[in-house]
From Swiss-Prot:
Catalyzes the attachment of proline to tRNA(Pro) in a two-step reaction: proline is first activated by ATP to form Pro-AMP and then transferred to the acceptor end of tRNA(Pro). As ProRS can inadvertently accommodate and process non-cognate amino acids such as alanine and cysteine, to avoid such errors it has two additional distinct editing activities against alanine. One activity is designated as 'pretransfer' editing and involves the tRNA(Pro)-independent hydrolysis of activated Ala-AMP. Its EC number is 6.1.1.15. The gene is proS. GO terms for molecular function: aminoacyl-tRNA deacylase activity; ATP binding; proline-tRNA ligase activity. InterPro entries: aa-tRNA-synt_IIb, aa-tRNA-synth_II, aa-tRNA-synth_II/BPL/LPL, Anticodon-bd, Anticodon-bd_dom_sf, Pro-tRNA-ligase_IIa, Pro-tRNA-synth_IIa_bac-type, Pro-tRNA-Synthase_IIa_type1. Its main location: cytoplasm. It catalyses: tRNA(Pro) + L-proline + ATP = L-prolyl-tRNA(Pro) + AMP + diphosphate. GO terms for cellular component: cytosol. This is Proline--tRNA ligase. GO terms for biological process: prolyl-tRNA aminoacylation. It is an enzyme of class 6 (ligase).
Length: 613
């Protein structure tokens, strides 16, 4: 392609809307154009990148035995109501675009396709002889993000590959899951990206286990915790670890103490001269279930730890049936306005004890009259701990848990009934010890999630009646997995991982073009002729090449070549007199003079080395 004929416009300044380097560079380099909030046009250079990423994805999926198809983007609400996810996606997470057609039928624009594919499997898969199956598509998805930002990282429409496997049993699912895991590793390696596969929370998709694939980048939205031995890595939302050991408490006598102005752990520990590991703090949450029921949750956790709200929400979803719901729509620390709707009296915030009386909850419609009491594992084994006294300005010291779990009254003075709900809701953090080897400590890195694979099990097949007849003649649910990778997100993540002050540094495998021939001076006939011949020969040899034949100064052309990130820049300049051209490698900035007849074999060698197969 000749740049003089391409719709090619670059910007010298960073657009005001862009926050992270990759977003700025894709806009400046003319790869994308903003059309609306979270909505972008893919311009010709970007479309070539997306085509290359899609082709690598397609090749690896096909190699793993998956079959390509295309599913409808408009989905009937009834399918999502069958699976129980309509309210979750239109109310709780609220990420589905919902619409009503002229017959007043509710529809959704597909953010994902579990319901559609399960319906197809229900209709077409009858017997174990048809298993296993794995279907995938590469398609535009839609999600109504609350705050679209970062360009293609969090947009309202994006290109995604989603695959769905159907197996006879859990063992076969694990085989399919393993194949997809390897396919994703192959995709990322072939795209030239540094990444980690990490344990992850399954969220609204559900299932028994999942992994995210994180492209490592300083601006990544996600925090990854990992061990240097390579045996553990997890998203911080899912990560588990061993906290530091609690220090033994010297406050062995139970008593109530006046502790004015100590409504934070730091202030309390300074006042009492104790370690935060000797404190049980009690954090109040407000959960709203999908049936409108509001539940107040009191979480007791060791004073040096923080609550992981993703883990907490998962625990509360498990309890949903107790309150007549299916899922949690909202989980918050209630502010003064929220408290005013249910609190019968002023709460002793900062001084709450594990036994805060249920009478603090006023008799109110749709408010559960009792606190849900949970205790994190970090607090269970504490002895002689410090905690609130349910009175502002006071704490108790030397407290213990009663031996009888779930006891409704204190066994004796100074003891608190241990809640029935003993859970792991603490946030793992860097420096914690690893479970698999306490000598290993967790390190931290930032990552961009570009892929997520799930072992769904029978969540959808049971809900939607997708069954098959097994070898024993029994009708049993299909066992499912689902596997997503963001094609457009991966492309921007590659930029976020690899750029410099001058522009993008594309991995060779997914660069829009592999080489660009630059004519410094259009008035020099020898430069124009040599460049044109090279351009034709390179393309004929299978090396995708641009020709910068614009009537611009050489400096402008060089800056644009750096900005758009083409891996190899070939300049027909002064060295032509010696039968050579200058070849600059974008990644290393190294410059080499190469004889004209050696340009093609040299570039072929470099490209082969840079593109793992």
């Amino acid at each position: 392609m000749r740049l003089s004929q391409m719709l090619f416009v670059t910007l010298r300044e960073d657009p005001a809307e862009a926050e992270i380097p990759s977003h700025k560079l894709l806009l400046r380099a003319g790869y994308i154009r903003r059309i609306g909030s979270g909505v972008y046009a893919y311009l010709p250079l970007m479309w070539r990148v997306l085509g290359k990423v899609s082709q690598i994805v397609r090749q690896e999926m096909n190699a793993a035995g998956a079959q390509e198809c295309l599913l409808p983007q408009i989905q009937p609400a009834e399918l999502w109501q069958e699976s129980g996810r309509w309210d979750t996606y239109t109310k709780a997470e609220g990420i589905m675009f919902a619409l009503t057609d002229r017959q007043d039928r509710q529809l959704g624009l597909g953010p994902t396709h579990e319901e559609v594919i399960t319906t197809i499997a229900r209709d077409l898969i009858r017997t174990y002889r048809q298993l296993p199956q794995n279907l995938y598509q590469i398609q535009t998805k839609f999600r109504d993000e609350i705050r679209p930002r970062f360009g293609l990282m969090r947009g309202r429409e994006f290109i995604m590959k989603d695959a769905y496997s159907f197996d006879a049993d859990v063992e076969s699912l694990r085989v399919a899951y393993g194949k997809m895991h390897q396919a994703y590793c192959n995709i990322l390696q072939r795209c030239g990206l540094k990444y980690r596969a990490v344990d992850a929370d399954s969220g609204a998709i559900g299932g028994s286990g999942s992994q995210e694939f994180m492209v490592l980048a300083d601006a990544g939205e996600d925090e990854v915790l990992y061990t240097e031995d390579g045996r553990y890595a997890a998203n911080v939302e899912k990560a588990i670890s061993l906290p530091v050991d609690a220090e033994p408490s010297g406050l062995t006598k139970f008593e109530k103490r006046e502790t004015p102005g100590t409504d934070t752990i730091d202030k309390l520990c300074q006042f009492l001269k104790c370690s935060p590991t000797q404190v049980v703090k009690n954090v109040l949450y407000q959960a709203v279930y999908d049936n409108g029921q509001t539940v107040l949750v009191l979480v007791s956790i060791r004073g040096d730890q923080e609550v992981n709200e993703v883990k907490l929400q998962n625990e509360l979803v498990k309890l949903a049936g107790k309150f007549g719901g299916k899922t949690v729509l909202a989980l918050t620390v209630p502010d003064a306005e929220m408290q005013s709707k249910w609190a019968s009296q002023s709460l002793p915030l900062g001084y709450i004890a594990p036994d805060l009386a249920d009478s603090y909850i006023a008799a109110t419609k749709d408010i559960h009259p009792q606190f849900v009491r949970l205790v994190d594992q970090t607090a269970v084994d504490l002895k002689n701990f410090v905690t609130g006294a349910n009175e502002s300005g006071y704490h108790v010291v030397g407290a213990n848990w009663a031996e009888a779990k779930g006891k409704k009254t204190k066994a004796k003075s100074g003891e608190f009934a241990l809640p029935d709900g003993v859970v792991d809701v603490r946030k793992a953090r860097p420096g914690d010890r690893a479970l698999h080897n306490p000598e290993q400590t967790l390190k931290t890195a930032r990552g961009i999630e570009i892929g997520h694979i799930f072992q769904l099990g029978t969540k959808y097949s049971q809900a939607m009646g997708a069954t098959y007849t097994n070898e024993q003649g029994e009708e049993v649910p299909l066992v499912m997995g689902c596997y997503g990778i963001g094609v457009s997100r991966l492309a921007q993540a590659a930029v976020e991982q690899s750029y410099d002050k001058d522009g993008i540094i594309w991995p060779v495998a997914i660069a829009p073009y592999q080489a660009i021939v630059v004519i410094p001076n259009l008035n020099e006939t020898t430069q124009v002729e040599a460049a044109t011949q090279l351009y034709q020969d390179l393309n004929a040899a299978g090396i995708e090449t641009l020709l910068d034949d614009r009537n611009e100064r050489a400096g402008v052309k060089f800056k644009d070549a750096d900005l758009i990130g083409i891996p190899y820049r070939i300049v027909t300049g002064r060295s032509l007199a010696q039968g050579k051209v200058e070849v600059v490698q974008r990644a290393s900035r190294s410059s080499t003079e190469i004889a004209l007849d050696q340009v093609i074999p040299t570039l072929k060698e470099w490209i082969a080395a840079a593109c793992p197969s």
